[in-house]
Amino acid sequence: MKTNCEFPLLCLLIVLVANVEGEVEDTGLKMVKRLWRNWEDPEQRQLLDQGTELEKQREKRLWRNWEDLELRQLLNEFAENQREKRLWRNWERRQVANEDDGEKAKELWRNWEDLKRRQVADLNDEQETQRDKRLWRNWEDNHATLRKRSADSLSRQKRLGKERGKE
């Protein structure tokens, strides 16, 4: 039976009732002692609460940074697409204005379209490569963060265990 009780007398009552009902045996007294130690040490409670709050803030900050990065990348891609559309329209206008020979213009148009298709294909390949690299870096960063957080938590638990063992 595990509980995190803010009122030690209520916890004691819960443990006693559980003992009477046969749910808790020898561990009941240990749990009462642990709860009482936690209740007596408000400084320790405050440190644990602060650590939890700092961890939550850090996670929120990491998430906002990632969202900001994604938004900037989308805006850059949109601006690049708009620039390409403007170039295309300007080229079309010049072709219509300078159209002397119909066949020559059609050939130039086809050549330009082929060039644009190749550029778009190359750009798409490059964007996919960059996206894959970005996703991999994000995964590595998140994995490293989780490993560090786990190690910090483990060392904090060991430290708390040693401090409680001295009592």
From Swiss-Prot:
Intracellular or extracellular location(s): Secreted
Modified residues (Pyrrolidone carboxylic acid): 95, 119
Residue numbers covered by the propeptide annotation in the UniProt entry: 23-94, 112-118, 139-167
Protein name stated in the entry: U-scoloptoxin(08)-Er5a
Span list, region Disordered: 147-167
Annotated coiled-coil segments of the chain: none
Tissue occurrence: Expressed by the venom gland.
